[in-house]
Structure formats: structure tokens, C-alpha cells
Amino acid sequence: MGKDYYQTLGLARGASDEEIKRAYRRQALRYHPDKNKEPGAEEKFKEIAEAYDVLSDPRKREIFDRYGEEGLKGSGPSGGSGGGANGTSFSYTFHGDPHAMFAEFFGGRNPFDTFFGQRNGEEGMDIDDPFSGFPMGMGGFTNVNFGRSRSAQEPARKKQDPPVTHDLRVSLEEIYSGCTKKMKISHKRLNPDGKSIRNEDKILTIEVKKGWKEGTKITFPKEGDQTSNNIPADIVFVLKDKPHNIFKRDGSDVIYPARISLREALCGCTVNVPTLDGRTIPVVFKDVIRPGMRRKVPGEGLPLPKTPEKRGDLIIEFEVIFPERIPQTSRTVLEQVLPI
């Protein structure tokens, strides 16, 4: 049975956004490993972060409410991919840093300085509700007076860094069949103290679908460098076709340049056309072939992006090789048989 994110935060289904925020504050403070040394606190802290990540996002929450964890994470109610709103495909995996989420939630401040920093900070406090001793509004800290001006209480609004773009080069064979690409990135992450920074390597997995067009963008939200003053940039991979030694791509069609002699162009020929999946198709031509002429082999191109069970065409583009010179006897014959 899948996870119940509402149960993780101690909420009932239908909880409001404010109730979700308050539940995250309460549970995150209770199980933060800096204060809770019990076995399993670290894992519980991660589960709380994942639950908040889902329930605080309207789209993820809608899918979870309809299909549960299995549908959210891609297994779907009938073994298919997770269903999003309006039937769109959606697959979720929690990649967040629970400590960074905690620090960002509290605006880069350490809430333990307020609630647990003094010797008597925990006296009379309900461990299940560390905010119970404070006159709080529905928003959390909004009505608490810590002896500072309101402007000092409110952290500066963070801005997200511009997207970081990388090329993702794929071969035509990979576009034909689909493939999985694993891209290693290095980025900076906040440590649990919310101030110091560590370098971290991460593997990003990209499922390249059949027929994807050049220029397709794959975005990994907030995987850029993180500091206490920014929202990490999105990492964006842009699909680029690798040059092919035989074919050229034209959307979902592939172009095969066929070099034939002048004699073949005039008298007819058979062209053995290779395909992306390794087959060879003999194509017979009986009519005169002009330089630059194109002929289609239907359905032998790349899969169509939206309907990959269908395919584009393989286009034969002719290049006619003319002889450097013609003997006089042959020239005489040609003059007699060729039309003016």
C-alpha cells in the first residue's frame, strides 16, 4: 500500500493550504535530526518533507488525491503511467533536500534559535505543537512579536536564478528506438545549518521518447546551485541531433542521398536503401531520374512524437554523377538517340 501523505503530516483529506503549512512546521520541528536524536528521526524528517512537497503543490496533490502514491509516481491505477489533469502524463519522484526545504521554509533563519535557543526554551512546550505557547495566526509567525520590527521579521523575497541550459546530443537510432540518458551534474547545496554550502554530484535520468524532435526541452526544476539567498535555477536539457554518416533528418522524415550514374539515371536502376533499424529495401526505378529528384518510401522514417506507432517517410534524394568525358563514338550514338 502506498504512502498516505495526509497521515504523515497528521492531517485529514481536504485540509486547507494553511493547515498543511502549519502541519509541516509542527512535524518538521518535532523530527528535525538536530533536535530529535531518536532512531528513525532522520527518515521521518525526509518523509515529512516529501509529504509537504506533494500536498503544497496543487497539481501533485490533485493526482495524489485521485490515484494515490502509485499514480503520482508513475505506476497508475491500471499499470500505466500516472495520470495528470486533463489526461496528461505525469510522473513524480522526490529529489528534494529536506534540510534545504526546511531552511527555505523558515526564510534562511534557524527557528531553533527562537524556540530552543535559551535554556528554558522548551519548558512548558507541547512537543507535538512547538508553537502552542505563542499567540499565532493562521499563517504561523505573522502575529508573533520577537522584539523586532515587522520588516526585520520578514525575510527578503528570494529570486530564482535564470535557467541553466545544456545540449543533449542523441543519434537518429536513439530517436528511432527511444533511449535512457543519465547525465551527471555537480551543484552546490545548502547544509542543514541553512548557511554553509557543500558540493554535491547528482545523476539526472532522461527518458528520451521515440520521435522526439530536435529542440525538445527537458527541465529539472531547481537543480542549479543553491545558496541561502537564492532559489536554485532550473536545469534544462535541449535535444540536439548528432550528425549521421548516412542520413539527414527533416522532422519525422529521414533523407537518404543516393548517388547514381548518368546511365542509371537514364536507363533505370535498383537502389538498395538502408533503414535506421538495419534493414535494406530494394527500390526499382524505371523512369528517367533527374538530379535532385526525390522519391518517398512511406512509413520508414522516424516515429511521430505524438503517435509513435506511426512513422514518417524515408526520402531518397538523387545525386546523378556525370562522366568527366565521353568517347566520340558514344557521343555520336547519344546524339542520335537522345531527344533535342
Swiss-Prot record:
<dbReference type="GO" id="GO:0070062">
    <property type="term" value="C:extracellular exosome"/>
</dbReference>
<dbReference type="InterPro" id="IPR018253">
    <property type="entry name" value="DnaJ_domain_CS"/>
</dbReference>
<dbReference type="InterPro" id="IPR001623">
    <property type="entry name" value="DnaJ_domain"/>
</dbReference>
<dbReference type="GO" id="GO:0001671">
    <property type="term" value="F:ATPase activator activity"/>
</dbReference>
<comment type="function">
    <text>Interacts with HSP70 and can stimulate its ATPase activity. Stimulates the association between HSC70 and HIP. Negatively regulates heat shock-induced HSF1 transcriptional activity during the attenuation and recovery phase period of the heat shock response. Stimulates ATP hydrolysis and the folding of unfolded proteins mediated by HSPA1A/B (in vitro).</text>
</comment>
<dbReference type="GO" id="GO:0051117">
    <property type="term" value="F:ATPase binding"/>
</dbReference>
<dbReference type="GO" id="GO:0034605">
    <property type="term" value="P:cellular response to heat"/>
</dbReference>
<feature type="domain" description="J">
    <location>
        <begin position="2"/>
        <end position="70"/>
    </location>
</feature>
<dbReference type="GO" id="GO:0043025">
    <property type="term" value="C:neuronal cell body"/>
</dbReference>
<dbReference type="InterPro" id="IPR036869">
    <property type="entry name" value="J_dom_sf"/>
</dbReference>
<dbReference type="GO" id="GO:0005737">
    <property type="term" value="C:cytoplasm"/>
</dbReference>
<dbReference type="GO" id="GO:0061827">
    <property type="term" value="C:sperm head"/>
</dbReference>
<dbReference type="InterPro" id="IPR008971">
    <property type="entry name" value="HSP40/DnaJ_pept-bd"/>
</dbReference>
<dbReference type="InterPro" id="IPR002939">
    <property type="entry name" value="DnaJ_C"/>
</dbReference>
<dbReference type="GO" id="GO:0051085">
    <property type="term" value="P:chaperone cofactor-dependent protein refolding"/>
</dbReference>
<dbReference type="GO" id="GO:0044183">
    <property type="term" value="F:protein folding chaperone"/>
</dbReference>
<dbReference type="GO" id="GO:0030544">
    <property type="term" value="F:Hsp70 protein binding"/>
</dbReference>
<keyword id="KW-0143">Chaperone</keyword>
<dbReference type="GO" id="GO:0045296">
    <property type="term" value="F:cadherin binding"/>
</dbReference>
<dbReference type="Pfam" id="PF01556">
    <property type="entry name" value="DnaJ_C"/>
</dbReference>
<dbReference type="GO" id="GO:0000122">
    <property type="term" value="P:negative regulation of transcription by RNA polymerase II"/>
</dbReference>
<keyword id="KW-0539">Nucleus</keyword>
<dbReference type="GO" id="GO:0003714">
    <property type="term" value="F:transcription corepressor activity"/>
</dbReference>
<dbReference type="GO" id="GO:0005634">
    <property type="term" value="C:nucleus"/>
</dbReference>
<keyword id="KW-0963">Cytoplasm</keyword>
<dbReference type="GO" id="GO:0090084">
    <property type="term" value="P:negative regulation of inclusion body assembly"/>
</dbReference>
<keyword id="KW-0597">Phosphoprotein</keyword>
<protein>
    <recommendedName>
        <fullName>DnaJ homolog subfamily B member 1</fullName>
    </recommendedName>
</protein>
<feature type="modified residue" description="Phosphothreonine">
    <location>
        <position position="307"/>
    </location>
</feature>
<dbReference type="GO" id="GO:0005829">
    <property type="term" value="C:cytosol"/>
</dbReference>
<dbReference type="GO" id="GO:0030900">
    <property type="term" value="P:forebrain development"/>
</dbReference>
<keyword id="KW-0346">Stress response</keyword>
<dbReference type="GO" id="GO:0006986">
    <property type="term" value="P:response to unfolded protein"/>
</dbReference>
<dbReference type="GO" id="GO:0098978">
    <property type="term" value="C:glutamatergic synapse"/>
</dbReference>
<dbReference type="GO" id="GO:0051082">
    <property type="term" value="F:unfolded protein binding"/>
</dbReference>
<dbReference type="GO" id="GO:0140416">
    <property type="term" value="F:transcription regulator inhibitor activity"/>
</dbReference>
<dbReference type="InterPro" id="IPR051339">
    <property type="entry name" value="DnaJ_subfamily_B"/>
</dbReference>
<dbReference type="GO" id="GO:0005730">
    <property type="term" value="C:nucleolus"/>
</dbReference>
<dbReference type="Pfam" id="PF00226">
    <property type="entry name" value="DnaJ"/>
</dbReference>
<dbReference type="GO" id="GO:1903646">
    <property type="term" value="P:positive regulation of chaperone-mediated protein folding"/>
</dbReference>
<comment type="subunit">
    <text>Interacts with DNAJC3. Interacts with HSF1 (via transactivation domain); this interaction results in the inhibition of heat shock- and HSF1-induced transcriptional activity during the attenuation and recovery phase period of the heat shock response. Interacts with BAG3.</text>
</comment>
<dbReference type="GO" id="GO:0014069">
    <property type="term" value="C:postsynaptic density"/>
</dbReference>
